[in-house]
Amino acid sequence: MKYVRCVLLTGALFNIAAGLKCADSKVLSRYKVSQHAAKGKFTESTPPSETTDFWWINLCEEHSEPVPDKCKDDAMFCHRQQVKLDDGKEYVTQVFDVPRNQEVDVEELRDGFQVSFTGKWGERERKVKVRYTCADDKAEDEVSAEGAFGAHTTPVEVALRGPSGCIQATEKSSGIGGWITWLVIYAVLLTLIYLLAKSYMSVGHGSMQDFREEFVERSTNLVSSLPEFAKEVMGKVVGGGPSSRGGYSAV
């Protein structure tokens, strides 16, 4: 597969141990990859036979899904090639799987992230690169690959497009909205502290009943003045000038 890698300036390679929860990874924990396993199937006419490649990827151990036929039970990645002859008989010709105890490199990209790892296929070691990109409109990840698996000198490159490459909803909702929420909370707390302090100073050594009445009165006055205050502020913001107020008559 050919693509241009656009690495974020703040992005770095994070090395984690495969089999650990994706929640423990600084990058993977931001995405929905722990909620899905991806699988793909590609059939090609190879006279006098028909060749089918099956791909299966379950990167995070948080997501439980049965491993496909012929793949090892501890696999997080599996490729199986199957040949169907013209007489209808089918034979599995290749199986390449990578166990969960293999180390995984995680790289955050501009439009998703990429994981890479190495597995053993017979006497050879094969490098695998899997790139995840977001597609909110898809319920499952679409898997695509380029080039013949038998090209031993090149990495196995697989692309996943779907929900796994999308950022978690909690991450999307953070930002300016989150800051505004905290500012409102702090404003309410500071106002409450101010009212309590002023009420206490006003009653001095009075009873608890006096303190409560003073606090309720101050709080009521504050709440009742908020609409007029907001109206005055909005008037100044939109250029209407200060609100009209009645003055005091000289006696």
UniProtKB/Swiss-Prot annotation:
One Gene Ontology MF term: phosphatidylinositol-3-phosphate binding
Any one GO biological process: pexophagy
Keywords: Autophagy, Cytoplasmic vesicle, Disulfide bond, Golgi apparatus, Membrane, Mitochondrion, Protein transport, Signal, Transmembrane, Transmembrane helix, Transport
Statement: the UniProt record of this protein carries the keyword Protein transport: yes
Membrane topology: Single-pass type I membrane protein; Single-pass membrane protein
Residue span(s) of domain MRH: 20-168
Listed transmembrane segments: 176-196
Disulfide bonds: C22-C60, C71-C78, C134-C166
Compartments, as annotated in UniProt: Cytoplasmic vesicle membrane; Golgi apparatus membrane; Mitochondrion membrane; Preautophagosomal structure membrane
Cytoplasmic topological segments: 197-251
Cellular component terms (Gene Ontology): clathrin-coated vesicle; cytoplasmic vesicle membrane; Golgi membrane; mitochondrial membrane; phagophore assembly site membrane; trans-Golgi network; vacuolar membrane
Lumenal compartment residues: 20-175
Signal peptide per UniProt: 1-19
Family: Belongs to the ATG27 family.
Function: Effector of VPS34 phosphatidylinositol 3-phosphate kinase signaling. Regulates the cytoplasm to vacuole transport (Cvt) vesicle formation. Plays a role in ATG protein retrieval from the pre-autophagosomal structure (PAS) and is especially required for autophagy-dependent cycling of ATG9.
Listed name of the protein: Autophagy-related protein 27
